[in-house]
Amino acid sequence: MEKKLRVYIETSIISHLDAPDRPDRMADTLRLWKGMQTGEYAVVVGSPVMAELEQCHEPKRSFMFEALGKIEYELVSVTNESRRIAGEYIGLGGLPRKGGTDAAHIALATLAGCDAIVS
């Protein structure tokens, strides 16, 4: 049995499931999402993604949570270790100081053993 690609998805992927103003991104995202629904990928979602979704306005927020409910995913939470790694990414110049959220996503994906981050 072939190992599934383990992907960490960021908020923008879920958001682009309903993006009529960006039909190209929406079409690409829908194709990817279909693979997630059929189990082609092992999907990982970080707690920062959930927090970002909570900040969205209705009806978009409900739509995105409903979409997440249609795929299997592993939820990973921010830990002291992920904070430390995110700080190192920024401290070493891998990301700008204002890139704290991106660093958090990357650190979580790293600790979760993801093969790719999809954004």
Region locations from a protein language model:
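Short, well-structured N-terminal submotif of metal-dependent ribonuclease cores
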Residues: 1-45, 54-65, 91-92, 96
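Active-site neighborhoods of divalent-metal-dependent phosphate/nucleic-acid chemistry enzymes
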Residues: 73-118
